[in-house]
């Protein structure tokens, strides 16, 4: 008997069974991911100016040469990275460093730090004659650590040829000259340049081109904080980037800004509110659409700096402040996972002040962009049917994960066919985010 597949409206010549198989299962929408914090290292004193480094929790020290430090070093900039990594999966750092490079002349060479800034003054170089040979070893130190060593060298040209350039650059009038031994000598005259508002503007502009979830701005300068708030509003409302920023003592009234108004002690150090923003940014980036950070403990923290009284806490919440408290177990915890929105309207109700709810809305917006890219579907009844199927599957996925509730798939995601003409398709979508049970009221009857 004849058989095979068939095309609609194309008749077969031979009698037989012709069978087409077609899956009715809808394509599963891809999910967006979270976990990335963005930190500007303002005046780091080392590293490529305007350089962008991507650090991961799997290998946080992969960029030691460009940071000039291990993230575990006792250093205020590294502290920011460490605090963010307590919850973030990825930390992207943007380096602002417009200082002068440290230099030194030794052994007939000029030795210049790879980057500007005062960290270059901690670099030392030694040229040592190798035993039993007419060759030399050149060693590069950063602080007490030997970071590079080149052996079997005879001339300056030999050294230049093998030098990585990660820490220092060697130059000489005559590179063919033989190396000569010299004791360990420190580079000097490296300076940290003054940070200008234009440097902050350059960082904020660069942030448009990077994929991240939460930015920490670890400075308490009013005009710079205003610039950050303006940029976040622009990114959310004009660019469609579902991001938030964490700032210290920033009086704002916007769901994209988290206003941190106290801090905590860690490793014997009292952090400023600006430094505490790093942990908040990491925790916010690391939390997903079904998670709240209310009452989450701060790993390693021992005390609250600027602990609020009951009345102060009530007022702070009313003003949209994010702050730390002490739990009954004597742990430093987040009092309430809220953003700075505190003046509510019919379009921005009180639930928009809850960061878990914002993560639901932001994640859904990201998933819509992943599921419905331009030029993927036909703008006709067949295309609308496919798109509605995908959208309703997305709603069901969110409901199954516990991110939204009260889903009526048919009425909560559909194409407005009367408006969908040409290359424009309009959707009507309904969402009710699930929040965490954070205020529990018990009516107890005693007998």
Go through each PLM region and give its residues.
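Structured, hydrophobic secondary-structure cores that serve as assembly/anchoring elements
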Residues: 1-93, 251-447
